[in-house]
Amino acid sequence: MPPIDFAVLAQVCAPWVAPQTMAAIVKTESSFNPYAIGVNGAKLTRQPANKEEAIVTAQWLIAHGYSVDLGLGQINSYNLRKYGYSVSDAFDLCKNMTLSASILEHNYQSAKKAGQGDQAAFEVGRQ
């Protein structure tokens, strides 16, 4: 896979969130690994080497009851179902960025409505 031009990806796929904000989140969540899989309560022996391996691994984990976080923004498997995304979508760079930014924005706005300050709302938005 060619190197990711993250600034362009963020600008095209999640233009309503500052690219610097998305970069900080993705760096923390996946270290910019588009095939990253985080298994909540467990750990993979190794991370997938490509998109196909990531999809098969994630599908197996979900089918066996694991809660997993997928791709650049580490989208949780619960949110895939909630927002109508597939496991394959989670490993599509643009779709992952779009959904990650949408979840961030939704959670941020919900926290603001609940009276949280900007920084506290941002922390809630990242969850």
Question: What is the predicted role of each segment?
Answer:
Residues 20-24, 35-36, 70, 111-126:
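Surface-exposed patches in mature extracellular/periplasmic domains of secreted proteins
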Residues 1-60:
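Export/targeting segments at the very N-terminus of extracytoplasmic proteins
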Residues 50-118:
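Alpha-helical segment that forms one wall of the substrate-binding/catalytic cleft
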Residues 7, 19-23, 95-105, 123, ...:
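Solvent-exposed, polar/charged alpha-helical surfaces in well-ordered, non-transmembrane soluble domains
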Residues 24-29, 74-78, 125-127:
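Short acidic/histidine-centered micro-motifs embedded in hydrophobic/aromatic stretches
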